[in-house]
Amino acid sequence: MCVRRELANAIRMLSIDAVQNAKSGHPGMPMGMADIAEVLWRKFFKHSPTNPNWNNRDRFILSNGHGSMLLYSLLHLTGYDLSIDELKKFRQLHSKTPGHPETGETPGVETTTGPLGQGLANAVGMAIAERTLSAYFNRPDYDIVDHYTWVFVGDGCLMEGISHEVCSLAGTLKLGKLIVFYDKNGISIDGKISNWFTDDTVMRFKSYNWHVVDKVDGHDANSIKNSIEEAKSVKDQPSIIICNTIIGFGSPNKSGTADSHGAPLGEEEIFLTRKNLNWKYSPFEIPNKIYDKWNFVKQGLKLEENWNKQFHLYKSEYPALAEEYSRRIKKKLPTQWYKKTKDYIFNLQKNPQNIATRKASQNAIEEFAALLPELIGGSADLSPSNLTMWSKSSSITENLCGNYIHYGVREFGMTAIANGISHHGGFIPYTSTFLMFVEYARNAVRMAALMNTKHIFVYTHDSIGLGEDGPTHQPIEQLANLRMTPNIDVWRPSDQVETAVAWKYAIEEKNGPTALILSRQNLFQFSRNNEQIKNISYGAYILYDSKKPIDIIFISTGSELQITLTSAKKIAALGYSVRVVSMPSNNVFDRQNIDYKESILPSYITKRIVIEASIKDFWYKYAGSEGLIIGMETFGESASEEVLFKKFGFTVENIVNKSKILLKH
């Protein structure tokens, strides 16, 4: 007969064996949290191992992702498509068990975790998504969206500043279906945390408006069970269950010490641990009696079957809602989307406006959000500056099925929360701040790229053109940083037409985040024919050709495109043949076929000049060894836009003079 401790020991021993086999990893956390995981996953966690993407499953987030073997053990034991051979391949190339959990690599992993605290932030986003969807779709007797978000966090997660940002917001939003287990073991890599982490966690979370369950014995099943039942009974607050645990539980010589945190226990200590836990089985051996107790396939299928029956009845009574729910979950765009957005873009070209691209972005949101109820926006306390609200924006603080989140001054938290909203499903999130402050959000931006998260970043005030606020607010190297991050498509449009195309592209893009880089100042709208409008979506296109053969190519983006075109025409007036290429998205352009790229930037034309008010270094791949770049080499200064553009060489006079020199060589 299996006792609960033996079931938890299966997690411990699989984790120990996998880490030892890989010769690296983190056994301490899985050993310490195994009892909590056993109670949660066997008695409370709602899921279907044969269908990891079942819509109404509970979400489980391992924010302390270094303890990944705990999650892999749970997935294996409960019946997911994760074999014992995959556990033996832990941390090996092309396995389903990478060192930290990665969504898309392992069935049952909801989000990629590892950078501490971000899993917690993703979980807040998932809880927001659950509550907002439930308010929108649920009807009396039909709880179509009804699930919990469960999170494991460690001391490190709560030390990270992002935990403050997201837990503060979660409490304000009263996310009652968010339940966090805090693995309070008092140990981190450097040793006992009492020397550097003495927060009163109870009072901290109470001040956030969280329900706190304190002094839970993390190795006692009844204590854990009672704490979960208490947390679930609280409907209008997120809950944190503070579990006192022993890191490396079961290891005679390394439990309770940093030695068990981030390295294999070693053969001798593993032998002693097996003996101490009365585990009589060989490495990676789990007896059938334990598998039988853990397996959740039948229960999962029953849960899913019951939900499917309910949804069938719901569909009969509320067919339009059911159809809309299915469309959003399947990530399909409305049938009228393509025609209406195309018509909108062509109409913009026919009705020119010289407006800032941040305003053009707001106009695009106004048009597109009316077609897409799944579009959920937000800003880090800069909504009036970013222009991210539209006429039907509704705050989720005031309206449970709203479509706008006031994140407060929490750039990092905002970005990671929206990653979670996206991974939950049913939404396309967009978030916004000044481009300069992407620095605060940087790692969550990178995680969005790593996870191929559909997330639209709206970054305004994109250059020294923002003016008098000075170098603290003027982005210089940020554009290059974003462009060089794999999987992010970066767009810096030059007018309202390019902005609308960029928004349309971002919404239609199936995988990965998109960054829209937008101006504070008004910009000139350019003339284009239908072919040019179509070619915007290829990332770069010919805006102007004087005659052939070409002597020089001008390449530019955003706010500098107007002075580039004016300069090029002056050079053309001197008898030279010039081409002006607008390159709103180099990432998208780079993915085009060789014929298209050659048609825009012929390789035999080596005299090229690039003009952009950002760091120069990025552009050499397009300018070439014989080309010239007019860009930024220093930080900006505090002055008006006009003064700064003149000081840093973004004038027609300077561009023309530099072009003449280039043409004479």
Curated annotation (Swiss-Prot):
Its cofactor is Mg(2+); Ca(2+); Mn(2+); Co(2+). PROSITE patterns: TRANSKETOLASE_1, TRANSKETOLASE_2. GO terms for biological process: pentose-phosphate shunt. Keywords: Calcium, Magnesium, Metal-binding, Thiamine pyrophosphate, Transferase. It catalyses: D-sedoheptulose 7-phosphate + D-glyceraldehyde 3-phosphate = aldehydo-D-ribose 5-phosphate + D-xylulose 5-phosphate. Belongs to the transketolase family. This is Transketolase.
